[in-house]
C-alpha cells in the first residue's frame, strides 16, 4: 500500500516538471550506507542514488512514513542528501538556510558547525524549521523603520521614525513604548503572542565606559518596554551584525550609510570589535538628499517636498567609477514621480553620490568614505586578532543610500588604490544583499533558525532575574 502511494507520488511529482539535477548544489554529503542485514526487498537491486532520487520525488511526509516501514528504508529516508533537497525546494534560499544552520545555530558566541561532523541532521532541521513560531521583526533606525512577520518574504510595513517618534536612540521609556505600540497596532497583533526580534540601532560607537553604559541603557530600556507589554521573548542584535548575516558572513567590515552619519564597523565572529576602532563620518543619507536638493534649486528644478528629492535620489542617482570622465558624458535621464509629474536630471545624478568620496564638493571637512574604510582596515591589520587577515577584507554595504548603483565598484577601486597591496589583495565590497531591507533579512535568518527562539532570545523571567543580579 505504501509503495503504491510512493509511486503515485513519484508520478505526480515527475509530471510537475521539476529539474532534480538543478537542485543538487555543490555540497559534500556523506554517502548512505546500508548494513548487510538491512533489506529494501525488491528495491535491493537499485543503486542508492536511484533510491534517493525516487524519494526526492515524494512529499516529505511520505518519505517519513516510508522510513517507518523498516530500518533499511529509514536509513535512506533520513539521509542528509534527501532533506537538503527538500530544504532547497523551500521558499528560503538554500545558501541562506545552510549558512544560518551551520554558522548561527549555536547562538552567541558563534560556533561553526560542520555539515560533515555528524552534529547536523537536516531531517531534524527540516522538521524543526516547520515548527518554529512566527516572530515579529522590527528593524528601527534614526531615519526609517521596517517591520513584519518572519515568515514573510519582506517587511509588511515601514515608517519614518524621525518624523513619527523622534530620536528612538534616546532611551526614553514613553517614546519607545509609543514606537512599539504603534507597530503592534499597525500589524494588528497582540505583543504577548509571539517572540520579537529587534535590531539595536548603531549609536554610542566608542569603546569607552561612557559609551558602553549608554548602549547598555538603551538595550535595557528596549527590554523593559517590551517585557512590560508582555512580549514572551526578545532577541536583540546589533543592526550592523544583522546586515553581515544577511550577506552570509560572520566576519567582515560593515559600512552603514545611516540617516545622519556613516559608520564603519569591524566585526569578528558576530562581535563588533570596538577596541579595534569604529570609524564615524559626520554625515549620512540626509546630507546626500540635501545636496541633491541644492543642485536642483540651482538648476531651477521645482519640487514639492524633500520626499520628492529622496525619490529622485533613489531612482536616478548613481556613483561614477571615474568622476572626471563622467563629467564629459551625456548623463541626462528622466523619471515620473507620482503626483508631481516628470523630472529630468543630468550631472546631479552622479554628483550627489560623489560627496561620499569628495565631501568638499558639498562644503564639508570630513573624511571620505574610502579613507574611513582604509583606516578601519589598517587598524584591523595592526590588531592581529587572527592568524588570517582575510576576515576584514570583505566589506558589506548597508543603508538606503548604500544601494546607489556603482557604489560598491567605486569603493572597491578606491580601496585598491589607497591601501598597500599587503592589505588590498583580496578585498571585496558587497552591495546591500537585500537593498534597504538588508538588516531586516539578517534578523529573518535568525528568527527562522531551527532552534529559535532557543539561545538567541531572552525571556521576561530571565531578564528580570539578570536585572536583580545587576542591582
Curated annotation (Swiss-Prot):
- Please name the GO terms of the biological process aspect recorded for this protein, alphabetically: actin filament-based process
| Binding locations of ATP | 256-259
Q: Which controlled-vocabulary keywords does the entry list? A: ATP-binding, Cytoplasm, Nucleotide-binding, Nucleus
Ranges of residues in domain F-box: 40-86
* Annotated compartments: Nucleus, Nucleolus; Cytoplasm
Q: Which GO terms describe its cellular component?
A: cytoplasm; nucleolus; nucleus
Which GO molecular function annotations are given, in alphabetical order? ATP binding; structural constituent of cytoskeleton
Q: Supply the InterPro entries for this chain.
A: Actin, ATPase_NBD, F-box-like_dom_sf, F-box_dom
Tissue expression profile of the protein: Ubiquitously expressed in all organs and cell types. Higher expression in seedlings.
Q: Which PANTHER family match?
A: ACTIN
| Family note | Belongs to the actin family. Plant ARP8 subfamily.
Give the protein's recorded name: Actin-related protein 8
- Originating species: Arabidopsis thaliana (Mouse-ear cress)
Upper classification of the source organism reads: Eukaryota, Viridiplantae, Streptophyta, Embryophyta, Tracheophyta
Gene this chain is encoded by: ARP8
